[in-house]
Amino acid sequence: MKKFIVFLAPLFISTLLSAHPEEPTPPVSTDVMWHTITVVDYKPGTVDEAKALIQKFETASETSGTTLPVIYWFESGKYDLVVTWKLKDGPADLKGKWSPDGETWWNALIAQEGSEEAAIKLQADYNELIASSVTSVARKAK
């Protein structure tokens, strides 16, 4: 889970990059772009609160100069949100806990929130809003 702290903290953390250990890591190919795609179902009545917390995560990303994910809000169906992240180094970004961008983003979130404890609480508060999420790895031809 290297490239992660990805969606925005918990979206960065909880909903991104759930690579299953039994699944093999696909080979890297130069003719494709790799992404993670996460769909999120929030608990009833919590979407507005989730949007407010996501804004804080996005602000930390903008401050740190790290890449923002592409976010879509659903108007129908089971899920409320889909988040896609480009994996700069392909599936290798899924190994380990932190990428350099993730660490930079995390430090910006700590500075923004005033302490590491406050940043951790923000992540926990966000995670409490999630009823379920599913993350998959996808590739797209260049």
Where are these regions (language model features)?
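Boundary of Sec targeting at the N-terminus
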Residues: 19-22
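Short, surface-exposed ligand-recognition loops at beta-strand->loop->(often short) alpha-helix junctions
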Residues: 41-52
